A protein has these predicted regions:
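N-terminal basic/disordered segments at the start of proteins
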Residues: 1-40, 281-283
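Small-residue (GG/TT-enriched) beta-loop-alpha framework at ligand/catalytic clefts
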Residues: 2, 30, 122-220
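Short glycine-aspartate micro-motif
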Residues: 21-25, 82, 173-177
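Structural motif
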Residues: 26-28, 83-88, 179, 229-234
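Short glycine-rich, Thr/Ser-proximal phosphate-binding strand/loop in the N-terminal lobe
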Residues: 28-57, 191-205
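Active-site neighborhood for divalent-cation/phosphate handling
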Residues: 36, 44-53, 62-163, 258-261
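N-terminal phosphate-binding loop and adjacent alpha-helix
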Residues: 46-73, 205-219, 223-226
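Accessory, usually C-terminal, subdomains that scaffold auxiliary metal cofactors
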Residues: 198-274
Length: 284
């Protein structure tokens, strides 16, 4: 893997890891991880790697196992290890309607393959259950690499993050999280979750179409709607951002410093880039 970022506080040692959580996101093109000191509520490590071209899940697991962290940091006795991955196979059930014995019935909504395992996360702030599929080989690989990881789909962390940092709890907010080949998009109205989806998106024209479709479907008054962006997007020379400005003249960037404190060594990090990763720390 190609290393894009690797910042680690020198005070992070095996003997201090018990007060820390390890957060890992495995995307379609990148692997990111962070280590959070839960006692001091501050960031201790942040790293990002480009994933190699892979043809199957065994190759992905092998690539992760080859990371130097698998022989060092990932072996530390952390308080909790949380791992998220990108999945289009998910559905939400309100907590008041959810019944454990009906999990397999709920899973029919996501059309799992025969090799999939069904997992469930609670999205506490939205009072919903997130039911999603993970390939059994991938699940077994994660449990082999990491010690008792809690596994999430990307939806859980993103929703927990936007609920925590919602800038207008009595208004309407549209959140868009950009990645190489997809976007996450969510809407909160008076703090209630109105919409969440993950969409394959390969160019600005596709994004423009999705944005207009969401505006129309939710009947959004864009003059009274806050737009918050995160992920791989910039305010200059970014075609996606220019499309946003056509409809929302004053978008704002999410701020991961509202999730966890960033000591001085992390001050050069663009706060919105790792918003979804750091929001994993808000998950149960």
């Amino acid at each position: 893997m190609i290393k894009l970022l690797h910042l680690v506080d020198n005070s992070l040692q095996s003997q201090t890891a018990a007060k820390c959580d390890l957060l890992i996101h495995i995307g379609t093109s990148k692997l990111q991880y962070a280590i959070i000191d839960k006692v001091r509520d501050e960031l201790k490590a942040l790293a990002e790697y480009v994933l190699p071209e892979i043809s199957n899940l065994n190759d992905l697991i092998f690539a992760i196992e080859k990371l130097p962290e698998c022989k060092r940091e990932f072996k530390y006795p952390f308080n909790k290890i949380r791992v998220s991955f990108d999945s289009h196979k998910f559905t939400f059930i309100p907590e008041e309607l959810y019944e454990n014995e009906k999990e397999q019935e709920y899973s029919k909504y996501i059309n799992p393959s025969t090799s999939d395992l069904i997992l469930t996360n609670r999205i506490r702030s939205a009072k919903i259950k997130n039911i999603f599929a993970i390939d059994t080989i991938f699940n077994a690989g994660l449990n082999q690499i990491f010690h008792k990881p809690r596994i999430y789909s990307q939806a859980t962390s993103f929703i927990e993050g936007i609920k925590k940092t919602n800038p207008d709890r009595n208004g309407t907010c549209l959140f868009i999280d950009f990645h190489k080949n997809h976007i996450q998009i969510a809407c909160l109205k008076k703090s209630d979750l109105e919409l969440y989806n993950i969409l394959e998106c390969y160019n600005a024209d596709e994004f423009n179409y999705f944005l207009l479709s969401v505006i129309e479907a939710l009947n959004l008054d864009i003059s009274n709607c806050n737009l918050i962006v995160s992920g791989d997007v910039a305010s200059e020379n970014d075609e996606y951002y220019q499309r946003i400005l056509k409809y929302f003249p004053t978008p704002v960037f999410s701020d991961s410093k509202l999730i966890v404190n960033h000591p001085e060594m992390f001050h050069n990090i663009i706060p919105h880039t790792y918003f979804s990763l750091l929001s994993l720390g808000e998950c149960e």
